[in-house]
């Protein structure tokens, strides 16, 4: 069987041999990858490394490759949103599993371990500001996974149907999907000191998360319905903006992934911590030790 050829219009490679957006080369990619949204957080993670091989930056995508306690790690910023995760996951997978010289799939496929460290808004009384939440399931309001074949195989369809039923989901909002973290990686990273939750990845920070400034909301009671949702003992614990695309695409590509977030605002208690950057290092240290 002839190998599939990836044309220059589909797989864009820069003149220096790096991939189009991330500006990383295949040799820059470790099997263990830590993803952060904020480019400034890359240096914070890498400050724990014993040594650094190289640093790369393009737009919001900043990367440092180094070693922590003998583990080679690539830490990379994604920017905000599932659209950026689509770029990051596809380009990381290409770096891992496509021969850039022949533009064909490698004979031996690599499985990456991907851990996203982020921030989120808590939705339950037991997720106050400062809580660490590991996303066992992620409900994607973004619709990204719906563009890929295998979407249903990578989704928890029963959970999805029950969610849409309980919150009286309006089809005009698009079709949500429910993607799961890798169970083994979830157990390793969450251990016994993180809340294992159900996360909603929203397509925006304001309206999609129920924040109302000058523009009114299409469904002002949606957040209340989300907070009251319960299925098989699981509730929606938090809002963020990337976890569903990460979990869904990683599953389809054969990689392991999990998202862990620190709660910086609790929507029920109307509390927020704007100076969270001083305290997220504790979560970073846990992930570095456990990845």
Question: Residues of each region from the PLM?
Answer:
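Metabolite-binding pocket within alpha/beta catalytic cores that recognizes anionic/polar moieties
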Residues: 2-177
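Intrinsically disordered, low-complexity segments enriched in small residues
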Residues: 21-28, 203-206, 281-290
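Structural signal for hydrophobic packing residues in well-ordered secondary-structure cores
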Residues: 49-53, 93-96, 100, 189-193, ...
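Glycine-rich beta-alpha junction loops
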Residues: 121, 138, 200-207, 245, ...
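Active-site rim beta-loop-alpha module in soluble metabolic enzymes
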Residues: 158-231
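A short, acidic, amphipathic alpha-helical segment used as a generic capping/interface helix at domain edges
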Residues: 223-233, 239, 243-249
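Zn-dependent metallopeptidase/amidohydrolase metal-coordination segment
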Residues: 244-275
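His/Asp/Glu-rich mid-to-C-terminal helical/loop segments that flank catalytic regions of hydrolases
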Residues: 266-291
